[in-house]
Every structure is written in C-alpha cells, then in structure tokens.
Curated annotation (Swiss-Prot):
GO molecular function, one term: alpha-1,4-glucan glucosyltransferase (ADP-glucose donor) activity
Pfam annotation, one family: Glycos_transf_1
Taxonomy of the source species: Bacteria, Pseudomonadati, Verrucomicrobiota, Opitutia, Opitutales
Signal peptide start-end: none
Protein name (database record): Glycogen synthase
Function: Synthesizes alpha-1,4-glucan chains using ADP-glucose.
Recorded family membership: Belongs to the glycosyltransferase 1 family. Bacterial/plant glycogen synthase subfamily.
Annotated EC: 2.4.1.21
Keywords: Glycogen biosynthesis, Glycosyltransferase, Transferase
Highest taxon listed in the record's lineage: Bacteria
Record Gene3D superfamilies: Glycogen Phosphorylase B
UniProt binding sites for ADP-alpha-D-glucose: K15
GO biological process: glycogen biosynthetic process
Annotated metabolic or biological route of this protein: Glycan biosynthesis; glycogen biosynthesis
Amino acid sequence: MKIVHVASELFPYVKTGGLADAVASLAGMLADSGHEVAVFLPGYRAALEHRDAAAAERRYRLKVEMGQQYLSGDVRVFSPRPNLSIFLICREEFFDRRAPYGNGERDYEDNSDRFIFFCKGVVETLRLADMQADVVHAHDWQAALLPLLLREAERRQGGMLAMKTIFTIHNIAFQGIFPRAVFARTNLPDELNSVDGLEYYEQINFMKAGILFADRVTTVSPRYAEEIQTPEFGCGLDGVVQTRESDLVGLLNGVDTKVWNPATDPLLPARYSRADLAGKRVCRAELLKRFGFAPDFDGPVFGMVCRLAEQKGVDLVLANQGFFLSQSCRLIVLGAGELRYETAMKALAARAPNKIALSAKLDEAMSHLIEAGSDFFLMPSLFEPCGLNQMYSQIYGTLPIVSRVGGLVDTVIDADQQPEKGTGLMCEPTSASLLDVLARAMTLFDDKPRYGTVQQRAMAREFGWNVAAAGYERLYRDTL
C-alpha cells in the first residue's frame, strides 16, 4: 500500500511527547513491511537542522490560499531509510522557531494559521506530486483538517484526490480551538461553519473536523476509546465521538525495540537483559551519581519522566512530598513544562537535595538512564490515552506505578491484586491512593524475592510495534 502520515511531530526530528515516537515507530514498521510510506511534517528549524535533512531536495513550490490571500512556501523531501520519505512543509514565518507550539508559557498566537497552512500545504503537495495514496493517516488536532480538506479538494477537482482517510486521537484534551473568525482562513464552504461542521460553542474546533469527516477514527488504546465517549474523559467532544462509535477503534501503541531495549541501548553505561541484570545495577549507581546521591544507596529509587503538567499527576506527587521527605528513598524527576510545576518541583528539590532531584529539561539520554536505573517508575496520570513510559519501564525491569486510567489499564497488571500475573502497581488518580501505592511499593521493594519475580515477569512482556502495526494494516485494508 501507499500510506501517507501527517503529523506535527516525528522522532528524531522534533519531539515534545509520545506523538513523535508513535508516528515514527508506526511509519518505520510499515516501511520495513514493504509499504511505500510518506510522512508530512512542518518544516521546523529543528527538522531542517537535523543531519538527515542535509540532503533534502527542494522539490515543490507552494501557493496556499488562506482567506483573501495566497501564502507561499516550499516542500523539501528526503529519505532516511528504504520505503520511507519525509516531506517538510516549509514557510519560515510559521515554522522557523525554537519550539513547535509555543514559547513555554503560552501557545503561539498564530497556531491556527500555522496548521491551516500546513494541512493545506499537504493537500497541495499531494496534488502537485500526483501522489495517489491508498490511505492518508492524520494525527491529532494539528492535522485534523486533512480529511475535510481532502474531501473538499476531491469534490472540486473531480476525484483527483480521492483517498481514504484515518484520523487518530492521541490526546483529546488538546483540540485546536480558535475564534470563529479563523474559519474564513480555511476557505471551506460556509455550511461547515456550523454545529454540524467545525463550530464549537461559538468557536471552531479542528479536532472535531477530524472526528467527523475521516473515514475511520482511531485512538491509542482500547480503554481510551471507551473513555473519550464519556463526559469525564471526552473533554467536551464525547457526544461527537459517540456519533462515530461504529467507526472508532482503539489500537494500543507499541514500543520501538530498536530504540528501547536494555540489551542493546547505546545510551546506557551498561547493557543488561532479563537473564543478566548486572548492567542494571551499574545503571542504578550511575543514575544516583549523576544526581549527586550516594551510588550505593540501598533504598528504592523512584523515577519520573514527563511533561510537568496537570495531566501527568504532578499535583499528586507534590501533595505526597511528605512521603519522599520522610522515607528512605530517592525521587528523580526529569521534565519541563508548565512554569508553576517547574517552580514547585525545583523548590521541593532545593528543600531536600539529599533525597529529591529535578532536571527541568528534555534529555533523551537521561530518560533512558532513569528508566534503566530506577526501581520504580511513577506515572500517576489523571488521564493517559496510551502512555509509553510504563511499557519502557517494564522492558527495562523498572516496575511502573500508574493510575488506573486509559492505556495504563491495558498495559500494567497490579502485583497485589493479581499476584501471579502482576507487573507493576496501580492506584486511583488521587493523592490518597498514590500515598497508599507508594507504601505498597516500599513493602514490595523490601521483599527482594517477590520484587525479583515481578521484575522478571515485567521484562518478559512483549510491547513491540509489530502487533500495533499489524492492527493498522488490517484497518487500512478494511477502509479501502
């Protein structure tokens, strides 16, 4: 099949979260299976500066209609591996910036124009290249206009762009909601500026367009597919999602085991496997040393790697700071995000530098070391569409402590509730429940034979992308 992916992030070119990993892994797995795969990505500064893009060819000039004006751009193309091409939709005014979505404190004010241009640029490139894909797969709100724009282009151009579309919701909390006046910049028919189209409480909602107009809708875990049809987790779009229930499927993300494998991981000071954990002990000592702790500390090490945001349960961790201050344990946090959380975590680390450490930045190598060197991985999310770190943790023999939400339910088994199957520990997304599970973690860690049994069971689990990619292949064929 000829498959086109459209996304705002792609590892290793630009990454702020799991979207980049998921799109890269799925596209790579499909390419390795012999499909002809193209990924469209905004021409961010970081992407253009990546070594893979050094040989990028400027292949097409774009002239994109945006309301009453036309904006120019160009398309640069390179191929980092067989069967995979990367198309960068470039316009310096929109994408030559330090970060993809905002300055750290707020979103860019022109994000609506940036991603309308991006989506329209993809449609125009497909036309210029006469690229008749079997499936166009759009990811999250930044690409959510694609199914509708392709439908309208097909209607105007007599079937030239007749392609099946898939829209994946990676996180329904981020929807691309803008003032209603933005609709004019899309040049879509006026009837779509309504409750049956993009209108959303006197604004417009990009994600709503993807949900309504794609041929099929997916999300990133079976549990999350159920949750987003409820008011508690649907973030105002639960009713819209319910209208597509028969076309909705939850396909669990996988792990790229070429990147995340403790036996081959080049970012670790020592490699290890389920059969030989000596390297994990080396990683643990190095992790403690890097953050200024005694490398031979014999209490549990809790690791946490995440965006510092409300969704990730940072409030719950802060509410339980008394536990980390009073217990013989260490807490190591890697993450950047909302200023209030960075400030609070820095203050906590400064209060107890002999127990708690924070590195407030994105550091891929350190994220690998935390996964390898910790004893437990904290992931007390308020909601979690799929989550990847809980899978990385199990592969690396680090027991995940997770909330009972979304994809975490589909991937972690509580060792207390199911002693013969458990691979981690689970709690409700409340501070009291997190405190209880932290106490359970201390008890489990002290029982070394039992901890070792759960660890072995966790490392034996299979989370490779081969299963997820096969599910998408079936979905693509069913959609054709």
